[in-house]
């Protein structure tokens, strides 16, 4: 069921109203406490600016890091408030706590169009427990609820799910709406052929996604460290490459399932090997049937790249989740960069390219190709769960569209 969106609320609905907006401001900081990537803050600007323009009092709620229900000064949202203020070109007041006297005083002092950022909601253990009393206090600051934190939508927490019991309407922000349109659309009503590229080191973390995608896709391309579990399941020697011994049967089952459904399941034909796990390791390219002892695979090989590019050539929708190799090491980033370049070219030809969160986003940004993709998801775990066909609690809690 489609969810009600912020677009359905006009200035008459919002002017002078206190609006609680759950955002995803979980940004990386360096050792000096400075933000190194403000993508998530910028992603929330359309929703925040729309509310400011409609005369709302904008109360932002966010988490940062994993403080485990304790106040941790290193995880305060102070640098986020400063950066948001720069991006909005107006002051952003930050509260000392997300509930209590200081939060109430700062909210009560707001004029229409003002913005207040509540302190890290995870300083309270009740947030992750979805405690009703805590949710009611948080909701008590506002009259309307907007969830724009897709990256936290797979969590049933007080600020994502609990508050919706006390605030009406409860609607999706523009970022949330865009994520749902692209990710659900890709799975439910894709332009075909639909291909998924799944990478990463472990089969175990992508089991649900692989099973769901084999059900829905025309082609599934697998890269990253997880390929060696598939090779070993086929009886091949993999040297000292990463293998999940307890997932060998599952790998066989996934291959059999794809075959039975007529889905093209592609594994790399060659790999780039290293003699140890290091950026300056000695390397060689080998066919997957001839991996020598003592070597480990850290990237897909040049032939595999060509085969993957050919397979993607006629696709109208491509979902990518997980790198092809250890792209943090320049020597073993070639496969990942080649896939990023291929998807950028396909986008230019009208293919819908969706980068499904996590490391693939970092890889695309590192390659300087982020603006060439149709959609880059801001949620790692949330995008995986949505692709698996799971219901996201933070989405389910919102009002249905009329």
From Swiss-Prot:
Its EC number is 2.7.2.3. Substrate binds at residues 24-26, 40, 63-66, 122, 155. It is found in: Cytoplasm. ATP binds at residues 206, 297, 328, 357-360. One of its GO terms (biological process) is gluconeogenesis. Its main location: cytoplasm. InterPro entries: Phosphoglycerate_kinase, Phosphoglycerate_kinase_CS, Phosphoglycerate_kinase_N, Phosphoglycerate_kinase_sf. It catalyses: (2R)-3-phosphoglycerate + ATP = (2R)-3-phospho-glyceroyl phosphate + ADP. Pathway: Carbohydrate degradation; glycolysis; pyruvate from D-glyceraldehyde 3-phosphate: step 2/5. One of its GO terms (molecular function) is phosphoglycerate kinase activity. Monomer. HAMAP family: Phosphoglyc_kinase. Belongs to the phosphoglycerate kinase family. This is Phosphoglycerate kinase. It comes from Parasynechococcus marenigrum (strain WH8102).
